[in-house]
C-alpha cells in the first residue's frame, strides 16, 4: 500500500461496526449525543480509526473497543459467495470488497472468510479475464455493462489491465504481420 494510493485511502474510510467496551467521555459526537459514549455502545467507525482503537491496549487493561466484521462480510454474503461467487454483485456490498476483506483478515483469525475470499477471487478473476479479452467484441453474452457494474475496484483494475494487455498484444501482432 502506497501513501498516495487512493484505493487504500478509500478502503481505510469504509465504515465497520464496533462496540465500545468502556465509558469514553467527550466522544458523544461519534454517536450524535451530547454526552460521552457509554460502555457497550454500538456504532460504525472508519476502518482506520476502529482498527487503531481495537488494537490499543495497555498492560493493565483491554482494548477500549471491540471490532466486528462489516456487513459486506456477513454470514448471508459469505453464504451467497460459497454458493456461486459469480452471482453476487460485490460492488453493491462494498466498492473495495477485497481490500476490506484483506484488512479484516489481518485483524481476525477467520479461516472460513479467507477461504471464501480466495475462492471468490479465483472464480471471478477467470470471468474478468474472459470479459477483458472479449471487450472489443461486444462482451460475452451481450451483458458487458451489467457485468462491469458488479465488479469491485480490484476486479475493475484487473479488467483494465487485462483489456490493455489484449489490446497491446493485438497491436503487436498486427505490427509484426506488416513487417
Swiss-Prot record:
GO terms for biological process: mitotic DNA replication initiation. The keyword Chaperone does not apply. CDD domains: GINS_A_psf3 (cd11713), GINS_B_Psf3 (cd21693). It comes from the Eukaryota. One of its GO terms (cellular component) is GINS complex. SUPFAM superfamilies: GINS helical bundle-like, PriA/YqbF domain. It holds the Pfam family PSF3_N. Keywords: DNA replication, Nucleus. The keyword Nucleus applies. Gene3D superfamilies: 1.20.58.2050. It is found in: Nucleus. The GINS complex plays an essential role in the initiation of DNA replication. Component of the GINS complex which is a heterotetramer of SLD5, PSF1, PSF2 and PSF3. Belongs to the GINS3/PSF3 family. This is DNA replication complex GINS protein PSF3. It comes from Gibberella zeae (strain ATCC MYA-4620 / CBS 123657 / FGSC 9075 / NRRL 31084 / PH-1). The gene is PSF3.
Amino acid at each position: 500500500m502506497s501513501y498516495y494510493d487512493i484505493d487504500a485511502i478509500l478502503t481505510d474510510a469504509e465504515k465497520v461496526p464496533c462496540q465500545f467496551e468502556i465509558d469514553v467521555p467527550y466522544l458523544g459526537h461519534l454517536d450524535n449525543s451530547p454526552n460521552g459514549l457509554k460502555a457497550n455502545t454500538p456504532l460504525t467507525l472508519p476502518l482506520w480509526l476502529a482498527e487503531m482503537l481495537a488494537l490499543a491496549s495497555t498492560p493493565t487493561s483491554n482494548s477500549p473497543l471491540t471490532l466486528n466484521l462489516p456487513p459486506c462480510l456477513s454470514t448471508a454474503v459469505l453464504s451467497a459467495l460459497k454458493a456461486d461467487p459469480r452471482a453476487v454483485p460485490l460492488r453493491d456490498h462494498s466498492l473495495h470488497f477485497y481490500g476490506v476483506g484483506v484488512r479484516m483478515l489481518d485483524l481476525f483469525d477467520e479461516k472460513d472468510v479467507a477461504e471464501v475470499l480466495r475462492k471468490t477471487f479465483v472464480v471471478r478473476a477467470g470471468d474478468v479475464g474472459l470479459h477483458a479479452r472479449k471487450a472489443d467484441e461486444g462482451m460475452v453474452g451481450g451483458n458487458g455493462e451489467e457485468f462491469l457494474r458488479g465488479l469491485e475496484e480490484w476486479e475493475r483494475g484487473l479488467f483494465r489491465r487485462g483489456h490493455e494487455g489484449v489490446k497491446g498484444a493485438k497491436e503487436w501482432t498486427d505490427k509484426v504481420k506488416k513487417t
